Regions:
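Short, solvent-exposed loop/edge-beta patches enriched in aromatic
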Residues: 88, 96-97
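Residues lining the SAM
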Residues: 90-93, 119
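Conserved N-terminal segment of class I S-adenosyl-L-methionine
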Residues: 1-82, 86-90, 103, 201-207
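S-adenosyl-L-methionine-dependent methyltransferase catalytic module, highlighting the catalytic core
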Residues: 4, 12, 97-101, 105, ...
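Residue-level signal for short segments within beta-strands and strand-turn junctions
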Residues: 60, 212-213
Length: 213
């Protein structure tokens, strides 16, 4: 996805409901991100501009333009123990085949009272194949982050918004653009408004996790 969709999703986008919720969550925690920041699975670093920091280190598991570190986070992050103030990891955990190993490495490199902001799917179509391994529940996060002293888990969109997003994806994939485009706008508007009126956390498309070491 282009940077614009991450940073400024529009009502005409077939990913609007999903990405607008991620963006809202990121902005809500932006003031907690500080000091030396490690962005895991950084890609184009779409949310970097929302943070205030002293140093920003980007990490990917493959060579990518502008990336500082290439490493497998399930084995070892090539940084010293307790050297990082903040870790961010957006829409990546579902693509990591050993998520507990990755979370343990995040915990190792974080300073005491360091923070980790992570987002990932609860429900989404298969993507990034063949490396699409998991979908997560709050209980999975509590287990994965059990070494951290504090873990805050939030839904990113309620049941109505999430179901509407899945419908939008189906329409976008199957119908001609001349038909799908106006339908997507209508469904995006309905999904956003209805979710505020009859919000239910029992099903969500995405979660954010904010953990403190």
């Amino acid at each position: 996805r282009p940077l614009r969709v991450w940073q400024n999703p529009k009502i005409t986008d077939d990913i609007y409901l999903h990405f607008s919720e991620i963006l809202r969550g990121v902005k809500g925690y932006a003031n907690k991100i500080h000091g030396t920041v490690l962005d895991i699975g950084a890609g184009k670093m779409p949310y970097r501009k929302f943070f205030k920091y002293d140093k920003y280190i980007s990490l990917e598991n493959h060579k990518y333009p502008g990336i500082d570190i290439t490493a497998d986070v399930t084995k070892k992050i090539p940084l010293k123990n307790e050297s990082i103030d903040s870790i961010v990891c957006f829409q990546v955990l579902e693509h990591i085949n050993e998520p507990q190993n990755a979370i343990n490495e995040m915990h190792r490199v974080l300073k005491k009272n360091g923070v980790c902001l992570l987002t990932t799917h609860m429900a989404a179509p298969l993507h990034g194949l063949p490396h699409d391994y998991y979908r997560f529940t709050p209980f999975a996060f509590k287990h994965l982050f059990r070494k951290f002293k504090s873990v805050e888990i939030k839904t990113q969109g309620g049941a109505v918004l999430s179901i509407m997003q899945l419908i939008v994806w189906g329409i976008s994939e199957k119908l001609p653009k001349i038909i799908s485009s106006p339908l997507i706008v209508i469904l995006n508007i309905i999904g956003k408004k209805l979710d505020k009126i009859i919000y239910s956390p029992v099903f969500t498309i995405n979660y954010s996790v904010f953990a403190i070491k």
